[in-house]
């Protein structure tokens, strides 16, 4: 078989429009090494059911800089593994953006051409991605009954009706529609949503209760029909439930079955976890898995294993068990709860939030949700009511611990569906990740090829197995490769030393842990912040650890500082990354455009600046790079998984923006006290921890938040260099950053010598949050020397370039 270096030769790459990148070759080589590695020695462990053989997959970690061709390298390694062994491979991602890139941007065809080998590849998506023909017909009947005539909607309906049994399943998804149009149709000014039109989903919005105390919530009424109205429309169409199910699931079932037959399956992290839990029933016999966007794998697992409750789904379950419909009023209340949860998600950037924090930060929404929950009733389904009772109690007690559970609002990792969660115990993500790559078989069981377990090493002493790990059947993975642009822990001295433990990988199972960064790839310059701007939030005490996202007033001086940066040199295109939609709303308000609390708004273009608001999905916002009238995009959604590239006149592709502005570091909010105390107890109860003090546990949690922040910052900076010809200027405008001492001293002296009105004043004895202290560690090594020659953006709005400083300053 041809070696990797020969595959990535210039002669092979040039016809594909690709350039040779040594780092891409190295990534593919590392992945192949991991996939070829022998299984680690098995261990004999003692469980409650007797002695068993515990076997982990051969695993490896690969970190590579953004834009270096990780995805094509992974596909090449997967194709070669399929041909070499006959085994099937899964490639798992977190974002749908990367799945679309693999599917639509030619990565699969390029990988096939490089290897010279043909394989069957399927992209496996969930049923919520498929359009329900019966729901489309039901809405169409309802709109016709109400006299609604909309050309865009008619075009959408005609497209759905044009499907035939020979239509490819993926051509019946929302992704296929968005290949032609940016959004779903609007009817009477309201945008239809995917969860309203997808198979197996109920509408998430509906009429508010007739006695809703807040009469201003007019958006709860009108467009979206109640389930009863949909049922009436279905009856008019004479569509029986069995026929409806068969009609809706036809393409999805073909899609799912085809994926089981293919050599390589592209899917997402949650599906991989469900595949393991189902004993391989979802994807079939998969022997190897490559996790792309690995840094988001823990988030997907954490969300998947939380106990989630959605009111309208609870009513559906009750209807099935009782055999009759629930009262229409309860349907209305459930729909109103869903709308309220969606609005809360927009306020909190779809992060988990407890009732106590909600009451503090958004009291009107807390009161509204508490009233709706109090009115929500589910009769005749007692087995499903314990979680609902805990939720109601938590709101009555303002978020204190209720029974044995912690109640909070959460949002699904991919589709961002809201749910009320009851979590009785901390989700042990590391343990759950270990389950994906661990198998247990009885010692005296007859070994079979399907077991995928190597013979136990007789020299290994018996150990006590983790009973929780043992509970989950092995999915069949013999090899697991983890790849990402942000695997490392930027705070540790050896950034890769302990990363494998975060993913439940034993040291003995670790084949390779490598980092790759090209010596030359693009160019990057920097602009650093003015610490005299103070902090983004006015409450200094609560913001001391970098939190501040929720419930704290914004600092108008900081907002104006960011506005000046956006307006500086308007001829240069800018991508402005900020952690929260609240930031976007506040920046828009400084322009004189205010939005009412809870208002779901579409993005606004003002003076050439696009303000991304929750009403538009991120992939739709990204398409605005093709518009000549957009000079800047402000968004919290494009930190990762996005390639904002445009074609040059010479045919090469470069990033759209010339400036990338980081408004503030994306620091996760500190958890509520009740959740933090629970996490501390879990850390102290871990028998593997040698240090068991509360201070140690709190410090560990603080470092974990800082690591999450820096990993996301690394991804955000990576948006700026996607190819060898890209040249980007990075603005780091968080005034809490700890500035390099030598650079700051040089700038201070230069400004003083020029008798400038601008000054650089460093705070004295400031206690820095770890992410604000160690941010330089995420700058690519090849660009770190540029930090000492950074420009300085003063509070006045003047940009002092390094040439300005050195020409007139002390170096002159």
Regions found by a protein language model. Give the residues of each.
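Conserved RecA-like P-loop NTPase helicase motor core
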Residues: 532-544, 614-738
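A substrate-engagement module of RecA-like helicase motors
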Residues: 2-14, 19-22, 40-56, 66, ...
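Conserved helicase motor "Helicase C" RecA-like lobe of SF1/SF2 P-loop NTPases
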Residues: 578-612
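Conserved RecA-like ASCE P-loop NTPase motor core of nucleic-acid helicases/translocases
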Residues: 88-96, 481-485, 572-584
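Conserved interdomain hinge at the start of the Helicase C-terminal
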Residues: 532-579
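A contiguous, basic/glycine-rich beta-loop/short-helix subdomain that forms a polymer-engagement track
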Residues: 201, 205-206, 227-260, 273, ...
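N-terminal targeting/trafficking signals and adjacent low-complexity tails
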Residues: 675, 686-693, 732, 736-812
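Signature of the SF2 helicase/ATPase Hel1-core->accessory helical subdomain module
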Residues: 74, 80, 97-100, 104, ...
């Amino acid at each position: 078989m041809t070696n990797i270096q020969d595959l990535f030769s210039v002669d092979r790459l040039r016809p594909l429009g690709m350039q040779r990148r040594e780092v891409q070759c190295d990534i593919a080589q590392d992945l192949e090494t991991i996939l070829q590695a022998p299984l680690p020695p098995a261990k004999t462990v003692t469980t409650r059911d007797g002695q068993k053989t515990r076997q982990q997959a051969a695993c490896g970690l690969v970190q590579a800089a953004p834009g270096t061709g990780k995805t094509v390298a992974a596909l090449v390694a997967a194709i070669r593994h399929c041909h070499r062994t006959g085994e099937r491979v899964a490639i798992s991602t977190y974002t749908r953006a990367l799945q679309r890139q693999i599917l639509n941007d030619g990565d699969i065809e390029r990988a096939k051409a490089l290897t010279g080998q043909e394989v069957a590849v399927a992209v496996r998506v969930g049923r919520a991605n498929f359009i329900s023909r019966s729901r489309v017909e039901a809405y169409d009947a309802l709109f016709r009954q109400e006299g609604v005539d909309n050309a865009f909607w008619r075009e959408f309906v005609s497209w759905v009706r044009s499907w035939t049994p020979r239509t490819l399943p993926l051509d019946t998804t929302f992704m296929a529609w968005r290949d032609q149009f940016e959004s779903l149709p609007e009817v009477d000014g309201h945008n239809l949503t995917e969860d309203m039109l997808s198979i197996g989903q109920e509408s998430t919005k509906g009429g508010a209760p007739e006695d809703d105390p807040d009469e201003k919530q007019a958006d709860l009424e009108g467009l979206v029909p109640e389930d009863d109205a949909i049922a009436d429309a279905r009856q008019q169409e004479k569509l029986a439930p069995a026929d409806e199910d068969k009609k809706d699931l036809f393409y999805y079932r073909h899609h799912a079955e085809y994926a089981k037959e293919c050599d390589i399956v592209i899917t997402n992290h949650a599906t991989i976890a469900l595949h393991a839990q189902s004993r391989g029933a979802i994807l079939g016999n998969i022997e190897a898995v490559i996790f792309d966007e690995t840094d988001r794998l823990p988030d997907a697992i954490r969300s998947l294993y939380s106990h989630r409750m959605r009111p309208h789904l609870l009513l559906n379950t009750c209807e099935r068990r009782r055999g009759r419909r629930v009262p229409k009023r309860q349907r209305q209340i459930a729909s109103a709860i869903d709308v309220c949860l969606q609005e809360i998600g927009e306020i909190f950037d779809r992060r988990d939030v407890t009732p106590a924090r909600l009451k503090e930060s958004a009291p009107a929404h807390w009161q509204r949700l508490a009233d709706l929950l109090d009115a929500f009733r589910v009769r005749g389904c007692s087995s499903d009511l314990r979680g609902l009772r805990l939720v109601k109690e938590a709101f009555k007690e303002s978020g204190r611990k209720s029974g044995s559970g912690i109640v909070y609002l959460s949002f699904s990792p991919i589709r961002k569906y809201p749910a009320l969660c009851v979590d009785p115990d901390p989700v042990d993500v590391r343990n759950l990740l270990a389950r994906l790559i661990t198998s247990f078989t009885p010692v005296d069981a007859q070994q079979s090829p399907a077991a995928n377990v190597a013979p136990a090493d007789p020299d290994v002493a018996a150990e006590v197995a983790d009973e929780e790990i043992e509970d989950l059947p092995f999915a069949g993975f013999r090899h697991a490769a983890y790849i990402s642009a942000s695997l490392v822990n930027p705070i540790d001295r050896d950034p890769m030393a302990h990363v494998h433990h975060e993913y439940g990988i034993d040291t003995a199972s670790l084949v390779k842990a490598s980092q790759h960064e090209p010596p030359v790839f693009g160019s990057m310059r920097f602009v650093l912040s003015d610490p005299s701007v103070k902090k983004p939030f006015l409450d200094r005490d609560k913001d001391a650890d970098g939190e501040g996202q929720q419930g704290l007033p914004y600092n108008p001086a900081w907002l104006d500082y960011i506005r000046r940066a956006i307006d500086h040199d308007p001829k240069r295109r800018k991508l402005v990354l900020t952690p929260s939609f609240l930031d976007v709303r506040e920046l828009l308000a400084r322009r004189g455009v205010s939005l009412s609390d809870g208002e779901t708004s579409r993005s606004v273009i003002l003076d050439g600046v696009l303000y991304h608001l929750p009403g538009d999905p991120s992939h739709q916002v990204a398409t605005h790079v093709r518009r000549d009238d957009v000079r800047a995009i402000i968004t919290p959604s494009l930190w990762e998984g996005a390639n904002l590239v445009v074609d040059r006149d010479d045919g090469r592709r470069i990033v759209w923006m010339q400036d990338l502005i980081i408004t503030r570091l994306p620091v996760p909010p500190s958890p509520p006290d009740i959740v933090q105390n629970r996490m501390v107890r879990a850390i102290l109860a871990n028998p593997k921890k040698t240090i068991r003090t509360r201070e140690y546990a709190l410090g560990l949690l603080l470092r974990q938040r800082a690591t999450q922040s820096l990993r996301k910052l690394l991804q955000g900076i990576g948006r700026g260099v996607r190819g060898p010809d890209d040249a980007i200027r990075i603005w780091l405008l968080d005034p809490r950053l700890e500035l390099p001492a030598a650079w700051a001293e040089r700038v201070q002296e230069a400004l003083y010598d020029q008798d400038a009105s601008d000054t650089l004043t460093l705070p004295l004895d400031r206690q820095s949050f770890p992410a604000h202290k160690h941010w330089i560690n995420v700058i690519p090594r090849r660009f770190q020397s540029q930090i000492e020659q950074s420009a300085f953006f003063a509070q006045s709005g003047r940009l002092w370039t390094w040439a300005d400083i050195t020409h007139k300053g002390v170096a002159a």
